[in-house]
Amino acid sequence: MPLGLFSSGKAQVLCDEKIPGGKKKEPKQLSENKCKGVTLKLDHTRVTIEKQIAEGGFAIVYVASDRKNNKFALKRQFTKDNEKQLEACCREHSFLKQCIGHKNIVEFVDSYTNCLGNGIWECMLLTEYHQKNVLQLMNERISQNQYLTNDEILSIFTDLCEAVSFIHNRPQPIIHRDLKVENVLISSHKPPHYVLCDFGSATTQILSVEKYGVEYVKSEVERNTTMCYRSPEMIDFYSGLEIGLKSDIWALGVLLYRLCFFCVPFEESPLAIQSVNYQFPSVPNIPDEIKVLIYMLLDIDVNRRPSIYQTSVLAFEANHRKPLSEEIQNKKCTDAVPSLKSCIQLMRDGSNPRNKRDSSPRNPEAPPIQSSSKMASLSQQVPSISNISMPSGSGTVETSVAPRLRPKATTVVPNVPSISPVPPVGLPHLRLPSKGSTDETDGSQVRKVPIDFHHRQSFSGEEQLKPAAEADSAGPLSCPLIKPTDLGFTDLDKPALPRDRAQTDGKRRLPHESDIIFQQQHRRNVSDTSQISRSAFKPYSSQQTTSKTSSQVVRSVEDMSQRQNGGSGEWNPFLVAPFSNNSISRKDGQESAFMMDDSHFGMVFDEIRRKEIPAELDSETSSIDSRDPFGAAPFDQLTVSTSSSAQPVSLPPATDEDDERQLLSETDEEEKYEIDEKEEIQTKKDETINEEDSEIDEQRMNDRRRYSYENIDGVGDDASSDSRGKTDRDDSEEEEDDDSRRGGDTSHDEDSQNTVGSEDGEGGSRPLLEDDGLEDDDDHELISSFSSSSTNYPPLFIGTSTPHTQNPITNPFLRDELTPKMIITAPLPTAKNNLDDDWDLGDRWTDRRDTVFERPASEHQNVFAPATLPRQATPLVCRFKPDLPTAAPVSIIPSMSNTSFPEAVRDSDTVPCEPIIGTLISVGAPTDPPPPPLPKKPTEASPTQETTATIPVALGKKEKLLKKEKKKEKKDGKKDKLKLEEYREKGSSEPETDGSEAEIWTNDGATTFSNKKKKKSTFGLRSSHPSIVANDLQFSSPMPPVVKKSSKDKKSSLTGKNASFVNTSFQPEDHDDPTDL
């Protein structure tokens, strides 16, 4: 049973499968798959869509068939509220109806236009169907690595010429505006016909900016044309040219180029289009008969571009057959058709390049648009008719115009355009009066002179374009200059009129009046390389030549007087500038009445010689360098004096003017000395300010430290003794020992400098520890104050009895009676042969501090780390903490410091290594290094027996000491508890700390501590860094091993909640006795 049950007998798709690539362009427009099998009714025909074959910017083309199975091409499109597009559809239908019967234009079959409501219109056009097109043919040849043959190229092009000739010769000419290979179809005849289609962009309207405006013309061009096929007048809307039939001729040239070389000549570049910048590739080998067609069609000049009739004649001549079209045969054309051979010769000679507009008159129907300023410039005229040579024979029109001349009341200078590749032509209707006399120059008196064709119009394998003006070997800018007197400079003392345009001197050729009009148009797109390539660089390329011949030029009155006097000084335009009547120039004691105006200044300024400064210079003649063009410029005297730094040039004998300059230079030198003194004073002030700033920064640093420490229960320098809790060391013997060793207090400033900024070789410039409350940027603030001294370094240890501490102690940390006392130590011995390399802490610290500071030039190694705790002026040695031992300690290892050890330990015979936790040490004042262990007397016992005998003795001593310390700790805990209760009974608001100097903060903001007594550390001072251990603090009795604290005991006694520690890195430290308050 067939599937076509519903309508036309064709297979119906019963599912909504979506084929990739189907697009929905407009409302109610169906996809490719849905449109298949759809039957549409036009005005006279009913067709069924079979498949989609093409899709354009506005419509989709389908293959449709009627009941007799005849194939048609159906162009269908929808528009919504777009009147322009709807009108374009109706025009296309109308144009194709007019072309019915032409073999090279697609045949019209039927059309349909319907309003679907809501502003939606459906437009359908039914034409004959051609299965192939030229683009497919080109793709096939590319796949076969082949090109089109010359016969195929000429056949396609001649058929297109017949089609375009038909539409151009209609009673109302039709402009296709979209000629391209995609719109050329191939019929199925033998031989095939090439058919033109797609008249959707066609129009009968000749666009003109003057008539329709720029915006309308621009929108029409962009909507209906393809970029790479656009003509130059479609690029430059301000050229004043019409966009009409000749735009199709240009598109035919681009189409022919693509047929030959499978590429477009200008790509998508408006610049290349506007400058007609293209070249012929060497492959494939295209004959000159086809190249000359491209050469003639791609002409920038609309009026010189051939018409469709001339193009058809040339094309059929190249194809060696006569035109078959009646329109071409019966065409009554008044234009002369050149022969193909003459065009080929013209192309080879290059005498009439096609990328330069000719002097042919413009279209009278649409004169070019000109701005008022440009039109006004046309009325300007040359100063003298004698300056223009107009030979009646074959000579060229030349003129010489002085640079930057202002038009005077009786002298008018024409606005001659800058030098460009535009061919020089005559001005047949331009009047050039001079001083009351008027002459007319006729076009017959002037012969056009071609210019070098410097663009990329190289015809591969052919003779290059030859310049016709090779005889003029001097160059366009090498003509002799005209003296100012010849130009009528008789009224230079009069106020000059404003000039219209700056001109540069050189050789000028007067172009045709029409070319002047064209060149003066406002080039909005500024994309014409012909206006850029030569005019921008020719003046500079010929500047050297002009300078060489400038010896014959009299540039100013000053120059003339110098030449007459035989002066060898270099002329300076600023010295003759109109600063004042008394300082212009003087000759024979008389003041000249010459007053140079701006135009004269501009002329002579361009002629400044640029030569090397002589080696022999005289500094006594003048402080102004005559070679410097700005040496005498009317600037401030201070600025003028700066030019005296350059070496002066020897000048002629001094005149009155030179005396004035000498006085000026002396005054400038005095002022310069005053300025130098002021600069020195200012430098001193700046240094003072910098010192004050450094003091302010130091004070700010101290304030930050004070603020940071005060927030952790008075650990800062300015913290009062009331803010510190009770310490865990109240031994009376140790208090007396501390009092005996403390001679006085140091001030806050000295203490802060000595504890933080002390410098002793390695130390001094190290910032505070990482967790003492300062940020990284504060550390950098400290650096600037610490690195001030480089030679004298104060001792690292501060003794209270030394001259360094003359003021009473104000540091609360030094006022603590239990704080260890510090004494100045003697310099350590330099011999460190018995030390291990791993314990060379000087190098370790150097590696760390060098990342921030530069090492002083002269310094000595110090084995002590320069870091101190906030309450400690004693240096600490950096060591890594070893892991806790699993067994009881056996012996002690003497460290690198000058620490006194028990005698039993000194007798130890172990190898030096890192101390083990739990080792009993006695930290005290630095003493001499421990002597090497004495050799033991040989005994009868074996080494194994000696070891076993020594270990029990050592273990027994250690156990006894540990027991004593535990008992003492219990007693101390009881005493501390009693003192704490007494302290609270007195009403003191300061709670006791646990020795860690860390403040407990509760949620309610109150600082409280647990009533439980924590175990105290046996070391009085511990570093905040785990690798730092107290080294040189001597206590009265040996200390037991450190007992680690657990943070679980630290809770708020009021709230019972876990407390957060502001600074948990501090280890237990000594606290003041509250009874001292």
Curated annotation (Swiss-Prot):
Query: According to the UniProt entry, which residue ranges have a biased composition of type Pro residues?
Result: 927-936
Comp. bias regions, Basic residues: 960-969
Q: Does the keyword Protein biosynthesis apply?
A: no
The UniProt GO MF terms for this protein read:
AP-2 adaptor complex binding; ATP binding; metal ion binding; protein serine kinase activity; protein serine/threonine kinase activity
Region entry Disordered, spans: 347-444, 488-554, 616-813, 920-1077
GO CC terms in record: cytoplasm
Every Protein kinase domain range: 47-317
Q: What does this protein do?
A: Serine/threonine-protein kinase which may play a role in lin-12-mediated cell-fate decisions.
- Name this protein carries in UniProt: Serine/threonine-protein kinase sel-5
Annotated organism of origin: Caenorhabditis elegans
